[in-house]
From Swiss-Prot:
Family: Belongs to the universal ribosomal protein uL18 family.
Organism of origin: Chlorobium limicola (strain DSM 245 / NBRC 103803 / 6330)
Gene name of the record: rplR
Name of the protein this chain belongs to: Large ribosomal subunit protein uL18
Regions of compositional bias (Basic residues) in chain numbering: 9-21
Pfam families found in the cross-reference section: Ribosomal_L18p
CDD domains referenced in this protein's UniProt entry, alphabetically: Ribosomal_L18_L5e
An example Gene Ontology molecular-function term: structural constituent of ribosome
Length: 119
């Protein structure tokens, strides 16, 4: 499968799932983006169109992390869950953004669940 086919396939899945996934202030959308070497996660309030918080493997505290990509993703999920609990957010809607729920995306979700987020 060529790169263009993969990108268009992911975009179609993303568009289909975005019709059903909608976050608000009390239950924001946990949006995940996975690049080749990094991972980014945001809590988004779709009603107001604002990002509540974001955590990534590129942030200052995460740049020096050792281990596999999956280990780093789990740590990013833990950090996101801890920050969300500090702001009083316990329930979220998981948006895998067209990526398969497997590998690094699953590791981030498991880390967020370990930190106490419910989805």
């Amino acid at each position: 499968m060529s790169q263009i086919d993969k990108a268009s396939r992911r975009q179609k899945i993303k568009d289909r799932s975005r019709k059903q996934v909608h976050g608000n202030e009390k239950k924001p959308r946990l949006c995940v983006y996975r690049s080749l070497s990094q991972i980014y996660a945001q809590l988004i309030d779709d009603d107001n169109g604002k990002t509540i918080m974001s955590v990534s493997s590129m942030s200052k505290e995460n740049r020096a992390l050792e281990g596999t990509k999956c280990d780093v993703c789990r740590i990013v999920g833990l950090q996101l869950g801890e920050k969300a609990k500090a702001q009083g957010i316990t329930k979220v809607i998981f948006d895998r953004n067209g990526f398969r729920y497997h590998g690094r995306v699953k590791a981030l979700a498991d880390g967020a669940r370990e930190a106490g987020l419910v989805f």
